[in-house]
Amino acid sequence: ELQSQTYVAQLKRNRSKYQKDLAAKKKQVEALNREIERIIAASMRGKGTGKIKQPVDMKLDSEFSKNKGRLPWPADGPVVDHFGLHYHPVFKSVKLPFNNGVNIALPKDAPVKAVFDGVVKQIVVMPGYNKCVLVQHGNYFSFYCKRGSTAVKPGDKVKTGQIVGTVDTIDGMNQLHFQIWKGTTPQNPELWLR
């Protein structure tokens, strides 16, 4: 009986600590998403029309769109967190922050590759995510986060399969956080990758 009470008390403490950690993580996720939306919105402004004017970008947009379900994975590893809303595996009533992408478990320093031809729009450093690279493909964007080294810089043209950086250990985990956006709307990456 005493053992059960001790276990319940420990679970309650863990839940409280986890909820505090989760609140901090939620703030990081929200900050990351706001920054992505800001960068994308700025990239897409074209004389008030919201469309990109350069023909090269529109060609990339069309080619990217045609490759839905056929893009290569940015790294070789298992998906450990999927797109969307999920609940904590132990505390079933606790919602995790909405995931606008997928998290892929990888060894430290594993290479991260561009999923399609594009232009590096920006490299952002975000708390909890380290270095993040945003690549533009017309009206589409791919986002590679939780990275250690960076092999590209803003303005660089990248090719499908080109290494854009490596994965770093953050919060004790070696994971790539990967997102795909169409304009300012996040897409489920698993529907785009083969």
Segments (PLM) and residue ranges:
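Alpha-helical oligomerization segments with coiled-coil/rod-like character
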Residues: E1-F64
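Short glycine/threonine/proline-enriched tight-turn/helix- or strand-capping micro-motif at secondary-structure
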Residues: K53-N67, D81-A114, K182
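Small beta-strand-rich domains/subdomains or short beta-sheet motifs embedded
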Residues: P72, A105, P111-V115, Y144-C145, ...
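Generic structural motif
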Residues: W73-D81, A110-V120, G161
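A residue-level detector for short acidic-glycine micro-motifs
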Residues: D81, L106, Q122, K146-S149, ...
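Short aromatic-glycine-enriched beta-strand elements
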Residues: P89-K92, P97-N100, P127-L134, N174-L176
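Zn2+-dependent peptidoglycan hydrolase active-site motif and core
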Residues: A114-S149
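Conserved, short, structured surface segments that act as functional micro-motifs
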Residues: V133-Q136, P154-R194
